[in-house]
Each structure stands twice: as C-alpha cells, then as structure tokens.
A protein has these predicted regions:
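Short glycine-enriched loops at secondary-structure junctions
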Residues: 139-144, 249-254, 372-374
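Surface-exposed, active-site-proximal loop segments in enzymatic domains
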Residues: 103-109, 144-159, 195
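Short, well-structured secondary-structure segments
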Residues: 111-116, 134-153, 180-189
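Short acidic/His/Gly/Ser-rich catalytic and metal-binding motifs that mark active-site loops
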Residues: 145-149, 253-262, 377-379
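Catalytic pocket-lining loop regions of alpha/beta-barrel enzymes
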Residues: 3, 159-162, 175-176, 181-184, ...
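Mid-to-C-terminal alpha-helical segments outside catalytic/metal-binding sites
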Residues: 2-41, 57-107, 112-115, 119-135, ...
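Active-site metal-binding loops of divalent metal-dependent hydrolases
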Residues: 47-48, 371-372
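Conserved residues at the C-terminal ends of beta-strands
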Residues: 51, 139, 215
C-alpha cells in the first residue's frame, strides 16, 4: 500500500462525521488460520507495524511530554493519533490481515478491532510461525510514513526530532527486543540535518540496528534531490556502519498515476514503476559509485521489470561516446549495469513469470516479502504462494531467494531459525 497519510488529516471528529468519512461498518476478525506445512523458510523483507498507543511514553524529554502525540479514542468512530493538534485516523488498510476483504476500507478502526499481531510483537511472532516466516524486516505504518516522513513534517522541529529518536528507541527496546533474531531492527531517519542523520545512524548501528527506511525520491517530499551533495554524510554513515537503506514504494508520498483521470487500479497496477524510476535515479546520481559498499533495497518493487531494465542499461552504453548526449557517468572501471547489479536488491511477493527468468535477473539480488498486514499481503498463504512461483527452481536458488539473500544482507542467523 502507499503512504497517503495526508488524506486523513482533519481538525475535529465532527468534521470527519460531516465529510461522511466514518460510517457504520462491519468489524469482523477471522479465526486463526491453520498452521502451514512449512516447505519454504521465508525471511520477509517488507512487513509493517502499526505502532501501539504507548509509542512515545517515557521516551521524550520532560519539556516535550505534554506535546507528545497520543491516541484519542472516539466511540464508535475509531482510534486517532493526535499529532500537534491534528487528528490522524488509523485507516484500516494499516491492519487488513485477518479481516474479510469485503470489510476493508479507508475508515479508522480501533486497536481491538484489528488482529493483535498487527501491533503486538509477541503476537506478530505467532502469526509468522503460522505461515513459515522465520524473520521479518518491518516498515512504519502509514501514520508515520513508510520512510518516517511525518516526523520531518511536524511544525515543531525539536518535537519532530525528539519523536523520531523516540520512535527508533521503541523499535529497539520493545519491537525488536522481543526477539532480535526474528524481528529485525529498523530505524527512521532525520531529513532536515544530515549531520544529525548520520549521528542517528551511528547511534543505532552501535546497538545492532540493521537498516534505515528512507524515501525513494526525497525531492518529492520537499527535500534536495539525490543529485545534490546534501545527503553525503548520511550515505557515508550508512556505508561505514553497514546499515542497509530500505526504499519502500510510495515513500515519496506518491505513486505512479498516468493521468489525472486514471482510476485507482491503474496506480495499483503500476506499483513497480515507482521502484524502476527510483532505481535509475539512485544509479545515475552515482550514489553507489561514491559509496561502493552501500546496500540499497527496494521494497514492494516487484522484479518483472528488471530484465527489460538490465537490457536497456547495457544497450545505452553504446551511446557513451555520442557527444550530444553528454554522458555523466564517472566510473572508469564499472558500467552502470555492473553497479546496478552490485548495489541494488529488489523484493517481490508475486512475480511468477519473472521467476522463470530469474537467472538472467541475478537470483542473488532477489528477496521475498509478505507485506503483512497490508491488503496486498500474501499472509497466511505464504507457503502456497511460494510453491506456485518457486517449485520449479533449483534448491540453491530457492534457498537464496526465500532466506539466504536476506540473511546475508541483514546479518540474520537463519541457521538458528530453521527447524
């Protein structure tokens, strides 16, 4: 799903009611699925957590405690985050798993109307066990932005910075601490000062945080483009600490829409286009040329576009001496396609055709994702989806795609997790 938090911002509950944003609705929780027979041991590199009401409790400086974002419940309308006086409804797409598809909507729900694994780490582990997921890398909910954009948008910069740090503390101290080998630690960045951003990466790396979620296209969220040198301290810190940069589709707060009249399903069909465009920008901004050990992962990207893109990158090299094009590539040893294959990883939950040509893509750069608990999620049928896509591949490729590549990338001790 795409981060579209701005659409739910309103001033009062009454305005919600007037707009008709909250209506009578069914609230059904499905029974637990039967535990799957595990054939594929999956590391999911793209799931989401819906943050609990206690997110900021005890984690902000005393002078900011009274301004802390908090949950406000309004019966029967739902639970809302109040952030600097603005109410954000918890759209139920943030917790669709375990609920009937015909009840999904953008309307706010209450925590107790959601499957507990959506926000409780112990129950998340149980839901992972039901589907054969041995480890999970998460992103924030849409409330805070898949790349933590909400913190940079807070009017009080000091409060935004403190909340960003508190969020990262919660991930380490509560979410990941429940089982650090399975709930892989992540962090959100600070966008307004790259020295602070670098220090935060270093602070978190020192306590075992493996990755940082970042915007696929920061220019679209009001920040300098990837072609500026603004981001250098942040990228340097990520490279030096081995912190993986995770780029989720929609983390630029937009998805592809061919025209103003395009229906929503057109954008859904084009989800992979965001990652395709972003990957080319990250490549030709030459970020991985300047930082050759940087690890960049695209989440919810799909892999179907990769054969075409790799072919095209190789083809356009024939024009490198064409003076009118003024090629900007500076690496004298590696061509763009070589750097692309070296520094980028891509994730998918459903690309059966592309898996037929995975060796041309490079199996070592393909990762699996489950996207729990979003509407696109393949939970609980993770094993079935894997079997329909992977059963015809060799065991070394299956093992690499389902868990081996992710284990190497995020330093996950999978040998202790596969039973």
């Amino acid at each position: 799903m795409t981060d579209t938090t701005s659409r739910s911002e309103v001033a009062t509950f009454e305005e919600l009611q007037v707009r008709g944003a909250v209506r009578d609705r069914k609230r059904t929780l499905l029974p637990d699925p039967a535990p799957a027979e595990v054939k594929y041991h999956v590391v999911s590199v793209d799931d989401h957590v819906l943050e609990p009401p206690t997110l900021f409790e005890g984690r902000l400086p005393a002078r900011l405690v009274d301004q802390a974002p908090k949950i406000v419940r309004n019966e029967p309308r739902g639970d809302f985050w109040e952030i600097e006086g603005v109410l954000e409804g918890m759209g139920d797409w943030n917790g669709a798993s375990g609920r009937p598809m015909n009840e999904w909507s953008t309307e706010p729900l209450q925590y107790d109307e959601l499957r507990r694994g959506v926000w409780d780490p112990k129950e998340r582990l149980r839901d992972m066990d039901l589907a054969g997921i041995i480890a999970s890398v998460c992103f924030p909910s849409g409330i805070w932005g898949f790349a933590g954009q909400k913190f940079m948008r807070m009017k009080d910069r000091d409060l935004g910075l403190a909340c960003m740090r508190a969020y990262n503390d919660w991930v380490v101290d509560e979410w990941s601490a429940t089982d650090p080998s399975r709930l892989i630690s992540f962090q959100v960045p600070w966008y307004h000062d790259m020295e602070i951003a670098a220090q935060e990466v270093e602070r978190n790396a020192a306590r075992g945080v493996k990755c940082v979620t970042f915007s696929e296209n920061p220019e679209k969220i009001g920040m300098p483009s990837l072609y500026s040198n603004y981001w250098e301290p942040f990228f340097r810190a990520c490279e030096e600490t081995g912190t993986v940069i995770n780029l989720h589709v929609g983390s630029s707060s937009q998805i592809s829409k061919p025209s103003k009249d395009s229906p929503e399903e057109a954008s859904l069909a084009l989800f992979g286009a965001n990652s395709m465009l972003a990957s080319i920008d990250w490549l030709y901004a030459q970020i991985p040329v300047r930082f050759p050990k940087l690890k960049i992962v695209y989440s919810e990207s799909g892999i179907g576009f990769l054969p075409m893109l790799l072919d095209r990158l190789e083809h356009i090299q024939m024009y490198r001496e064409y003076e009118l094009l003024q090629f900007s590539w500076t690496d004298k040893e590696l061509a763009p396609v070589d750097v692309f294959r070296r520094n980028f990883w891509f994730s998918t939950f459903w690309d059966p055709i592309a898996f037929g040509v995975i060796e041309s893509i490079g199996a070592q750069r393909v990762l699996l994702e489950v996207d729990y608990p979003h509407p696109d999620s393949i939970w609980p049928d993770v094993q079935g989806r894997c079997d329909r896509q992977l059963s015809g591949l060799s065991k070394p490729i299956i093992d690499a795609v389902t868990h081996g590549n992710a284990a190497a990338l995020f330093r996950i001790p999978v040998e202790n997790l596969i039973r």
